[in-house]
């Protein structure tokens, strides 16, 4: 289909990427409608996908996506955990609407639902896993583009891109290639510049799934560089602690702690003997009672 145009021909670099990510490795089973995309079958029963046909269907899907005037009318769906990162990157670069995770039934058919959408085109990662979205798209007449393995059913699929849709690197590479071809057809990039957006080169591994546990292990395994402070300048940790200590009224220096200042008790009354104070209070009370009694006897009622 694209053999006459050198611009859209399969390059050696892209073919190496497809082989390195095992995009050509299919499944042991093969659907009768997917036999046209199979090159041959290995001795262990695994079907090998014809990469030239994969590339041709990828270009056809890119042309269909680029034909939509409003990129937001293109809806991308994936329920596979390791395809959601690629899906979000594709949506960010092309402007399409992502639906990742579980697809809520009625999202395309139930108009009173909060998540109701009316897309003009639907793209899924696996027609078997995302069967709910494919079925609802058939009810409302929305065309569907799907990445299909050799054992994937093609019912309600308008454009099937044969590839290994179960591999972590394979599915990420296919989303990356699809986004690149869409932007190329729209004229936002060229073959000479490569996949460059906002002066940043978009590499295929940006679309690959990354396990959070492995990321934490890599961060812990990386050696951290300890920068030596300038002479006479305290390290940032010590300077921060010193600032906090000074803010609460205590004075701490880098070399040690300054001696505590003596408190001035001249304004405080000296503490007296509590026993003497008690006896004095009792005597004053008795004297007052005697005065009250004398005034009562001498008073003339």
Swiss-Prot record:
Protein name, per record: Small ribosomal subunit protein uS2
InterPro entries linked to this entry: Ribosomal_uS2, Ribosomal_uS2_CS, Ribosomal_uS2_euk, Ribosomal_uS2_euk/arc, Ribosomal_uS2_flav_dom_sf
Entry keywords, A to Z: Cytoplasm, Ribonucleoprotein, Ribosomal protein
Gene3D superfamilies assigned to the protein according to its UniProt record, in alphabetical order: Glucose-6-phosphate isomerase like protein, domain 1
GO molecular function: structural constituent of ribosome
Species annotation: Brugia malayi
Function: Required for the assembly and/or stability of the 40S ribosomal subunit. Required for the processing of the 20S rRNA-precursor to mature 18S rRNA in a late step of the maturation of 40S ribosomal subunits.
CDD domains, A to Z: RPS2
Biological-process GO terms, alphabetical: ribosomal small subunit assembly; translation
Subunit-structure text: Component of the small ribosomal subunit. Mature ribosomes consist of a small (40S) and a large (60S) subunit. The 40S subunit contains about 33 different proteins and 1 molecule of RNA (18S). The 60S subunit contains about 49 different proteins and 3 molecules of RNA (28S, 5.8S and 5S). Interacts with ribosomal protein S21.
Record-stated family: Belongs to the universal ribosomal protein uS2 family.
A GO term from the CC aspect: cytosolic small ribosomal subunit
Subcellular location, record wording: Cytoplasm
Source taxon at top rank: Eukaryota
